[in-house]
Amino acid sequence: MQTEPYIQPMQSPDFKPILCIVGPTGAGKTHLAMSLAEHAQSIGLTVELISMDSALVYRGLNIGSAKPSKEEQATVIHHLIDILEPTEVYSAARFAKDAKQLCEDIRSRGNIPVVVGGTMLYWRAWAHGLSSLPPANTDIRARLDEEGKSLGWPAMHTKLAQIDPETAARLKPNDSQRVQRALEVFEITGKPMSALLAESPSEDGREGSVIPPWINLVSLEPSDRKRLHLNLEKRFDEMLVGGLLEEVKTLKANVALHADLPAIRSVGYRQVWEYLDGQTDWEEMRYKSLAATRQLGKRQLTWLRAMTGRNTFDPFNPNELKAALDFCKRNLV
């Protein structure tokens, strides 16, 4: 059986630790990264940003993903944006491999890599490596997909609970992608996914881990949750006014796309897709989108607050936001 190799983190004594800007959705990560890149340009340095966001990899997901504008991408070099069609799947393992290679390539050009984003599974894979889970088996996956369509994913979730109750307990019954993957792993290896993850060569990959010394983590953590939620509500309403509905209509016009694809399951896109399918009305779509966005932010903060060694700043405090930028400037080179 072939497995994806454990990805060793970069540890080079020739360079300072890599800056990584993280935070919950709506915390201002992109703004901080762009300010840092513009400062670097003003002193003759070049920062290249590596996106750590599972939605930004997809072409056509622009408005709902808060993708950096064409002007921003023209001003500062961005990587791992618009690299896939929404029919494709991008994994944490692939991100870890791509980010590692990009950091090496950027430094070989004499430039400075800065990783920015909030997809914490990508963070875990890049910072701590991955357990040796088997790669996808197309035959098994296709059969499980057919079973899921026939029996329904809640029934498949029940099946998973019988062989891997620990994994089933943390997955929603309709999370077809992850339920399918857990069943696939069991069929390939004969072991529950939870058992394989427990055998990971790096326990540091779990929540509560110490940040590796080759990363300088800047974490934007808003202290005012109510203000964050209001900002997220305002941003989503601006997305709706800015054409999110039309963007999802365009995606739906592609017959190769469906609601179970990872791209379409992205927060906001899934809810608008359901609305266009007639499953919800406008108010329910908006409510579900905002609830999903808040839940995403809560999960991101849970990940971050469990980490020791991070450099934390409140983006809603002007003095702390300035301190965050100053910290990044000091740690560029």
Swiss-Prot record:
* Enzyme Commission (EC) number: 2.5.1.75
What's its catalytic activity? adenosine(37) in tRNA + dimethylallyl diphosphate = N(6)-dimethylallyladenosine(37) in tRNA + diphosphate
GO terms for biological process, alphabetical? tRNA modification
Top EC class per UniProt? transferase
Indicate which residues the UniProt annotation says bind ATP.
23-30
What this chain does, per the entry, is described as: Catalyzes the transfer of a dimethylallyl group onto the adenine at position 37 in tRNAs that read codons beginning with uridine, leading to the formation of N6-(dimethylallyl)adenosine (i(6)A).
Q: How does it assemble?
A: Monomer.
What is the protein name for this chain?
tRNA dimethylallyltransferase
Protein species of origin: Polynucleobacter asymbioticus (strain DSM 18221 / CIP 109841 / QLW-P1DMWA-1) (Polynucleobacter necessarius subsp. asymbioticus)
